[in-house]
């Protein structure tokens, strides 16, 4: 039932108009159309349809959707479905596509010289190329590839979005990211992406959403020192102090002040890849990025010191059925001490 009801009638016929009624005619020959807007305050709010399903029906629907997703992924990997796009060699200045991965957690890792490093485990789950946009339709400089990561629920997706994934033959994704690529690194829509896209020893840039802290003061948000704790100070202990001067009579944009902290996308540059597990599609990245169970964006590092490392990487991406020989289950950097190596040796 709509929240607003529109009533439009004329003259004395509105709301039982009569001689003394609300809609009484003003006079002979002066009948006018009067517009009334009445708000309905007792309408029932809408609910999601699955709230009224039983537990057996919910499990049945989830199993049905899971089977359909597996069937779509299996049909997509059929090499006879259509012709692949031509592949081009790597050139200086080439830019590859990136990945979307799920943060599983953190663990320690040791190098052969005994140094300990904290690494983040990022798992690539159902990552596919969704859309190719040529540079003529983007900004005239670089083309883009839209990548989707981690299969999501289709129960709350709009019909237009479901139709887009249905045309691709893929299940709907939980999130999508856009990567700028060069013309020689273009990949066909529907191509699956694996953790072997990155190799141990290279450096990557990781973008993730920081943990939200809510509304915080300047001491926690920006690390301000604060005001003195005593000696005549009253109610100013954690305040920022002066935010401007009197002669300019304004506060400059960008002044550090209290506000919402966290819950923003932040990029960490130049993180080393220590290990790659090809069986479970897990990338071991140096440092801490994102929070647990969050989706992160990984791409080749754009720092000038690492721009020429791409010539030793699979280009434009790793193909399991390509010319490259079969990879082992675990790939390690040459400086990492593998878990199977003995920790103590005797001469």
From Swiss-Prot:
Ranges where the record places region Disordered: 317-347
Key words of the record: Mitochondrion, Ribonucleoprotein, Ribosomal protein, Transit peptide
Main location class: mitochondrion
GO biological process, one term: translation
Biased composition (Acidic residues): 321-333
Cellular component GO terms, alphabetical: mitochondrial large ribosomal subunit; mitochondrion
Alphabetical list of NCBIfam families matching this protein: L3_bact
Protein name: Large ribosomal subunit protein uL3m
Organism of provenance: Rattus norvegicus
Gene designation per UniProt: Mrpl3
């Amino acid at each position: 039932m709509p929240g607003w009801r529109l009533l439009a009638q004329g003259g004395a016929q509105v709301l039982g108009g009569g001689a003394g009624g609300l809609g009484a005619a003003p006079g002979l020959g002066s009948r006018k159309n009067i517009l009334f807007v009445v708000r309905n305050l007792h309408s029932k709010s809408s609910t999601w349809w699955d709230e009224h399903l039983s537990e057996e029906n919910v499990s049945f629907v989830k199993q049905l959707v899971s089977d359909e997703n597996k069937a779509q992924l299996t049909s997509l990997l059929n090499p006879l479905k259509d012709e692949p796009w031509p592949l081009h060699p790597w050139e200086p200045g080439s830019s590859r596509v990136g990945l979307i991965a799920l943060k599983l957690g953190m663990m320690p890792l040791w190098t052969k010289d005994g140094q300990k490093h904290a690494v983040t485990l990022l798992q690539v789950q159902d990552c596919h190329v969704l859309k190719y946009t040529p540079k003529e339709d983007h900004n005239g400089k670089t083309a883009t590839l839209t990548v989707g990561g981690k299969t999501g629920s289709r129960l709350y997706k709009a019909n237009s979005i479901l139709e887009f994934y249905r045309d691709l033959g893929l299940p709907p994704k939980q999130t999508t990211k856009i990567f700028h690529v060069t013309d020689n690194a273009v990949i066909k829509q529907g191509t699956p992406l694996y953790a072997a896209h990155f190799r141990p020893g290279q450096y990557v840039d990781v973008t993730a959403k920081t943990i939200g802290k809510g509304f915080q003061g300047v001491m926690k948000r920006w690390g301000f020192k604060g005001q003195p704790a005593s000696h005549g100070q009253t109610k100013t202990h954690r305040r920022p102090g002066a935010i401007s001067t009197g002669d300019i009579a304004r506060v400059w944009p960008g002044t550090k002040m209290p506000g919402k902290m966290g819950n923003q996308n932040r990029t960490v540059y130049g993180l080393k890849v220590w290990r790659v597990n090809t069986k479970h599609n897990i990338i071991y990245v140096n440092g801490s990025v994102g929070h647990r169970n969050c989706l992160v964006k990984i791409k080749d590092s754009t720092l000038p010191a690492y721009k020429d490392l791409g010539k030793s990487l699979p280009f434009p991406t790793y193909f399991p059925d390509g010319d490259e020989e079969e990879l082992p289950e675990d790939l390690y950097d040459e400086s990492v001490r593998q878990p199977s190596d003995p920790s103590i040796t005797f001469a």
